[in-house]
């Protein structure tokens, strides 16, 4: 047994060797994922939900909780919640309602948050999570419920950016009232040594699913997807769960894995030393450790009661069935089918998935390109452009249809690959459609034999020694003349045709 005192340099906490943890304890974890829905307006008012607006410019009496204001439920948010529940194999309840979650904090202007307590819209689901070894792990879903988001606090003056040690706190209420769906798993047992990886895989699968449903952009870096992880340990062979700690606002896939692993090691060190785990919330730090937050509240602390300003929600069976028809193929099943259709290896498919290119390649193929051509563009050149701009592939200012047009221009002999890249750069720069960029930049391949022959004659005259070598049978020397012609024509001549003309003129054709 190895307990390393102060093993976490940043936190100073004792950590138990990971192999010892999983040999002695069964980790039990649960995940609560908060997802901002991509609706145009907020959950209970008409304010915009645009990310990045000037602070406190997307607010009104309703989301500020001013006296006399009344909430009006966003129908689109309810429909998105139902679709999410269906995609998670949940039961959509015939009747649910909102409750007030009462607590006092600066980011809650009403001093309560409108949420759902004991009557959520979706219950008892599951998600088959694909793992890296091509197996799956079923994660049971306890509930998915609707609520409004809180405002955003920015703490100044502390080294960590958190409230501890801060001298000033700024509040932006633009986020207050943005529609949220909170997806809560049942306790996940039996994962053993794979617990951190399964936690990460679940959040990744959920992220892919919600993106496919087009209900959220699930940008963890922007806070539109946030994860809380509940972790506890119990001795192997026992039934009763241990005391859990809740790790708040874990904001990346890597952090989910790191947070679960660290917390297992921290709790393991306490338990083998005869200590007790405190029921508390903890903050995750990017250095890979957690620190104490506050004592964990219970449901009674929030004094839930039905919101008297909102009627119950009772989705009809007809509506639920209509929305069921809009649920697309699960993204990982779609990828497996696509991989078989394209005949590509697991490694190539993994690279496309990691680049976020699968759906873009598939859409390009639907627009007429071959899978090889589409992969070459999205998996190489366009990935480079996205990385240079520090954005994701789907944020590039080019569509799969436009990429397919570029591919067609190459196939038709109007562009070389090098010229096609310049056309794509023009599209990315906002210069117009591919054909227009080709014309405006004068990038079309030169196909006129008379123009190319004149350029060949000029190049041969400028380098008589090379011309003589070609006439003497050294056809490899034709490359120098081809290069000179390509330079003269700015790379727009058909190199293969230029070579044919050079050899013909020199009597080697």
From Swiss-Prot:
Q: Please tell me which top-level EC class this enzyme sits in.
A: ligase
Documented EC number(s): 6.3.5.-
Q: Which GO terms describe its molecular function?
A: asparaginyl-tRNA synthase (glutamine-hydrolyzing) activity; ATP binding; glutaminyl-tRNA synthase (glutamine-hydrolyzing) activity
Gene3D superfamilies membership: 1.10.10.410
Gene Ontology BP, a term: translation
List the catalysed reactions. L-glutamyl-tRNA(Gln) + L-glutamine + ATP + H2O = L-glutaminyl-tRNA(Gln) + L-glutamate + ADP + phosphate + H(+); L-aspartyl-tRNA(Asn) + L-glutamine + ATP + H2O = L-asparaginyl-tRNA(Asn) + L-glutamate + ADP + phosphate + 2 H(+)
Q: Which Pfam families match?
A: GatB_N (PF02934), GatB_Yqey (PF02637)
* Summary of the function given for this chain in its UniProt record: Allows the formation of correctly charged Asn-tRNA(Asn) or Gln-tRNA(Gln) through the transamidation of misacylated Asp-tRNA(Asn) or Glu-tRNA(Gln) in organisms which lack either or both of asparaginyl-tRNA or glutaminyl-tRNA synthetases. The reaction takes place in the presence of glutamine and ATP through an activated phospho-Asp-tRNA(Asn) or phospho-Glu-tRNA(Gln).
NCBIfam families per the UniProt record, alphabetical:
gatB, PRK05477.1-2, PRK05477.1-3, PRK05477.1-4
Family assignment?
Belongs to the GatB/GatE family. GatB subfamily.
Quaternary structure per UniProt? Answer: Heterotrimer of A, B and C subunits.
The name on file for this protein is: Aspartyl/glutamyl-tRNA(Asn/Gln) amidotransferase subunit B
What organism is listed for this UniProt entry? Mycobacterium leprae (strain TN)
Instruction: State the encoding gene.
Output: gatB
